[in-house]
């Protein structure tokens, strides 16, 4: 069975400018805009917003 195109893999990049990335899936139907999640950045040592890369 093929993977769904409605839930693509997206890269989340730290807004702190450290170059740290997370990889996750998102539902395009529910979240058509860029995804922003607050996650831990080990280089910065704190929780920062991670924004979806295009």
UniProtKB/Swiss-Prot annotation:
UniProt keyword annotations, A-Z: Ribonucleoprotein, Ribosomal protein
Gene3D superfamilies per UniProt: Ribosomal protein L33 (2.20.28.120)
Gene Ontology molecular-function annotations: structural constituent of ribosome
Pfam families referenced in this protein's UniProt entry, alphabetically: Ribosomal_L33
Record keyword Ribosomal protein present: yes
GO biological process terms on file: translation
Signal peptide region: none
SUPFAM superfamilies named in the record: Zn-binding ribosomal proteins (SSF57829)
GO cellular component: cytosolic large ribosomal subunit
Lineage top rank: taxon: Bacteria
Protein family membership: Belongs to the bacterial ribosomal protein bL33 family.
NCBIfam families for this protein: PRK00595.1, rpmG_bact
Annotated protein name in UniProt: Large ribosomal subunit protein bL33C
UniProt source species: Streptomyces coelicolor (strain ATCC BAA-471 / A3(2) / M145)
């Amino acid at each position: 069975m093929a993977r769904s195109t409605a839930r693509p893999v997206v890269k989340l990049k730290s807004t702190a400018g450290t170059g740290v990335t997370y990889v996750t899936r998102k539902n395009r139907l529910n979240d058509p805009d860029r995804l922003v999640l607050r996650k831990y950045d080990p280089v910065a040592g704190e929780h920062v917003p991670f924004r979806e890369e295009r």
